Regions:
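Eukaryotic intrinsically disordered, low-complexity regions
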Residues: 18, 271-272, 317, 321
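N-terminal accessory/pre-domain segments preceding catalytic cores
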Residues: 20-240, 352-357
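Sec-dependent N-terminal signal peptides of Gram-positive bacterial secreted proteins and lipoproteins
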Residues: 3-24
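Periplasmic OmpA-like peptidoglycan-binding domain that tethers envelope proteins to the cell wall
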Residues: 273-282
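A short, charged
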Residues: 246, 346-357
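Short amphipathic alpha-helical segments
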Residues: 168-171, 243, 247, 284
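Secondary-structure boundary elements
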Residues: 215-274
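Hydrophobic/aromatic-rich core segments of domains that either
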Residues: 283-350
Length: 357
């Protein structure tokens, strides 16, 4: 992202006859427009600094508070070093500070006199809006940051930014896909994910995830509301005193008897399957697994091949063993059937990726 550092040294303009301005250069205004307190937030009093380190920190503090402007005393610096230290402070906050690297587009400044003291007046330009700084989430680790990502997915937010204190390399696209697969009732459509890191290196970083959906946010919310009661009904459909295998059968019957399904891939698998009777093997497997988990049953989605073609099915647990269940195969052959791994002769999958006996 291009950063612009601009030092504006305006021509002197006589303004002794004007009022409402106390930022001067050699007794004159440094800006054509009157430079008055009304251009700054009330809390933006002049910041006192006496070293380059304090100057850098003052600029960081302004950015991290979401300020759009600020005035910093530079009385301790001579004219030859003010520009050097200011440009260094701006480079530091826009290139090394996580929040500055993420949020700031450019910083401009003027040098003059404020209330009789040599000072610098900064104007901070943000990528979107200064308020975005206040919306940055905070997490110590990537694991804690995941909760913020999941919350954004559940609300179909267009993006989320998290300041992570101890960042570790993470595949956020896979993280989103995995959460969506386990929660088809919540993540109605799996978005395309763009992950950006600010800065590019360092332990402390802002992670920005941008989500792109094909379906409107309003429609996704409506679909989510329509899907939720179906999952609740499925959970209630399971008899508490039934044997484990029978509970799996009950959920199979609940799902498979809803429609005469049409096999088709959609971008809203849970909604399309449960309200339109349209879905593919992955939609059946993910929805069934989610229903099982809500009912307290262990159930996994297995990705592999069936007769050489990409396929998804389920892995369930009862009677001390893991069994494979292909819902679509069951529907074609007359009912629920659970098979041991050794009996899945037409299927191939990574055995090490899934639990076994």
């Amino acid at each position: 992202m291009k950063r612009i550092v601009v030092a504006l040294l305006l021509l002197p303009i006589l303004c002794m006859a004007l009022s409402g301005c106390d930022f001067w250069m050699d007794g004159q205004y440094v800006s054509v427009e009157p430079y008055s307190e009304q251009n700054f937030r009330p809390e933006k009093d002049m910041i006192e600094v006496s070293s380059s380190a304090q100057l850098r920190q003052a600029v960081v503090d302004l950015v991290e508070s979401g300020a759009r402007s600020g005035i910093i005393s530079v009385a301790s610096f001579n004219d030859a070093t003010v520009h050097f230290y200011m440009e260094g402070a701006i480079r530091n906050v826009t290139q090394n500070n996580p929040i500055g690297a993420y949020a700031v587009d450019s910083i401009t400044y003027e040098i003059g006199v404020y209330s009789g003291v040599d000072a610098v007046a900064l104007t901070i330009h943000y990528r979107y809006d200064g308020d975005q700084v206040m919306h940055i989430k905070s997490a110590q680790t990537v694991g804690e940051a995941e909760d913020h990502v999941y919350a954004a997915l559940e609300k179909f937010e267009p993006s989320v930014a998290v300041l992570i204190q101890e960042y570790q390399q993470t595949d956020f696209e896979y993280l989103v896909q995995e959460y969506a697969a386990k929660n088809p009732d919540i993540v109605i459509e799996t978005p395309r994910v763009e992950a950006n890191l600010y800065p590019e290196k360092g332990q402390q970083r802002v992670v920005e995830l941008v989500f792109t959906y094909q379906t409107s946010r309003e429609n996704l919310r409506q679909m989510q509301e329509l899907v939720a009661p179906v999952f609740t009904s499925a959970e209630l459909y399971v008899q508490p005193d039934a044997q484990l295998r029978e509970k799996y059968v009950q959920l199979y019957n609940f799902l498979m008897e809803r429609f005469d399904y049409s096999l088709e891939t959609t971008i809203t698998p849970a909604y399309s399957l449960l309200h339109e009777g349209v879905g593919d093997c992955t939609a059946f497997a993910t929805v069934y697994a989610a229903m099982c988990r809500k009912a307290g049953l262990e159930c996994h989605v297995v990705s592999g091949t069936r007769e050489g073609e990409p396929w998804s099915w389920n892995l369930i647990y009862f009677m001390g063993n893991y069994f494979h269940v292909d819902l679509l195969f069951c529907s074609q052959t007359g009912g629920f059937a659970a098979s041991l791994g050794s009996e899945m002769t037409d299927y191939e999958w990574d055995h090490s990726a899934y639990p076994s006996r």
